Each structure stands twice: as structure tokens, then as C-alpha cells.
């Protein structure tokens, strides 16, 4: 009965959105995106305006002004994973040299392990059926383990960002393992991440009961991580965060 009342009194005439020029879904009436900010980190070219009409074109993705096609060609030609150097590029605005990449990979290695007791309190004791929900809760729990969670200076924000980059795959894998055990009746298998492995390799190792994966699987996952690495330059989620 109450639900019917809500349906009857909470409906908004769709024509009002056009009348008041409301940007539904952060889209203009012609389907183009609403400009809500400026960024030099990532950009996407997916259409052009011809005679006031939006015309689709072959999509292009740029990170810090570098075409992702060129970025991928570089690390795949040298047969190395690319997500780590892509993260470096997005954060610092330039590609790392050989020595800098080694240091960066080493830093991510040292940050992958979760704090003592974290997986028990944040994941195992409250296993969820929805992995995204589990990840969101784990990030909130990370507040309790951060030595300076409320500081907003660049150094603190960078430290937190690096920790999240390193630990997100571990949290996601552990959340899946907890779901598989408590909700799907499977054995619980939680390994520690290994140093010397890429982000993609560690994720696959943590997800598999036997810890095994093929080079092709690692390469494909690494490529997926590269293509999804920049998701904060002006998308709906980031806009909502800025507004709130």
C-alpha cells in the first residue's frame, strides 16, 4: 500500500526535464557529455559535431596526452606488463625510466599486503555476495588502519592512493574467496600476494585455487587494467563525489 502511494505521488513528468533543461545522466539533449570540470590526466575522443549533429568516430583514449595505443605498443613490444607504468604516468604526468619503474614496482610490492587483521575484520567476518559492496566496505574499514586518515595534504593523499592501487586487487580477490566459501560452499583459499609479480599476475594467482595462470591470461588482464586505469577525469561517479 505504501509503495503504491510512493508511485502515485513521486512521479515526475519526463517533459519537465526538457522544460527546465535538466542534464539527465550528465548528458545534453544531443547526447554529448556535460562539461563539469577540467583535467590534464585523461581524455576520450568518441565523436565529432557536424552541422550540430553528434557523429560517432573511431574512439581514441589518451593518458596525459599519450595515445593509449602507443602506450600499449611500447610495453607489449618489450614484453612487460603495462599497468604499473600506466599508474605512474597517470599520477606523475610522465612515463618512468627503467630504474624508476623498478623502484615503483618495488614500492607497489611493499604495499600489497593488507594490514594485520584487516582481511579478518573487513572481509572474512562479514562476507558479502556482492563483490563491489565488499570492496566499498573494505575501503571504509581502511580508515581505521590509516595513521592519518583525515589529512588532505598531497603527501598523505599520494600515500593513500598508492596503497589503494596496490591493495585493490588483493581486496577484490579476498572478497571473492570469502563469497565462494561462505555463500557457494567452496574451500577457503587466501594466499599472500607475491613480490616480483605484476598486479595482473598477483590477482590471477590470488583468485585461483591452484594459483596457476597462463602468460596470455596475465597479458590480457594487464591490458584490461590499463584500459580501465583512468576513471576519474570527469565521469559521473567523480562528478558526484566532487559535488557531495
Feature annotation, model-predicted:
Residues 1-244:
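Hydrophobic alpha-helical bundle cores within soluble ligand-binding/oligomerization subdomains
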Amino acid at each position: 500500500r505504501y509503495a503504491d502511494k510512493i508511485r502515485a505521488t513521486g512521479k515526475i513528468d519526463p517533459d519537465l526535464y526538457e522544460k527546465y533543461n535538466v542534464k539527465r545522466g550528465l548528458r545534453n539533449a544531443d547526447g554529448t557529455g556535460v562539461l563539469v570540470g577540467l583535467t590534464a590526466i585523461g581524455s576520450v575522443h568518441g565523436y565529432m559535431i557536424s552541422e550540430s549533429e553528434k557523429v560517432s568516430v573511431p574512439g581514441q583514449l589518451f593518458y596525459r596526452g599519450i595515445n593509449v595505443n602507443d602506450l600499449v605498443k611500447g610495453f607489449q613490444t618489450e614484453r612487460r606488463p603495462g599497468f604499473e607504468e600506466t599508474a605512474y604516468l597517470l599520477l606523475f604526468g610522465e612515463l618512468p625510466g627503467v630504474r624508476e619503474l623498478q623502484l615503483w614496482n618495488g614500492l607497489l610490492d611493499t604495499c600489497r599486503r593488507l594490514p594485520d587483521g584487516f582481511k579478518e575484520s573487513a572481509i572474512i567476518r562479514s562476507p558479502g555476495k556482492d563483490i563491489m559492496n565488499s570492496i566499498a566496505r573494505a575501503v571504509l574499514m581502511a580508515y581505521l588502519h590509516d595513521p592519518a586518515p583525515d589529512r588532505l595534504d598531497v603527501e598523505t593523499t599520494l600515500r593513500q592512493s598508492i596503497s589503494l592501487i596496490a591493495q585493490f586487487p588483493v581486496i577484490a580477490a579476498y572478497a571473492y574467496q570469502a563469497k565462494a566459501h561462505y555463500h557457494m560452499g567452496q574451500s577457503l583459499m587466501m594466499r599472500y600476494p607475491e613480490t616480483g609479480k605484476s598486479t595482473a599476475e598477483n590477482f590471477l594467482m590470488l583468485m585461483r585455487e591452484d594459483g596457476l595462470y597462463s602468460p596470455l591470461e596475465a597479458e590480457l588482464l594487464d591490458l584490461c587494467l590499463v584500459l580501465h586505469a583512468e576513471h576519474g577525469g570527469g565521469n559521473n561517479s567523480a562528478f558526484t563525489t566532487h559535488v557531495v
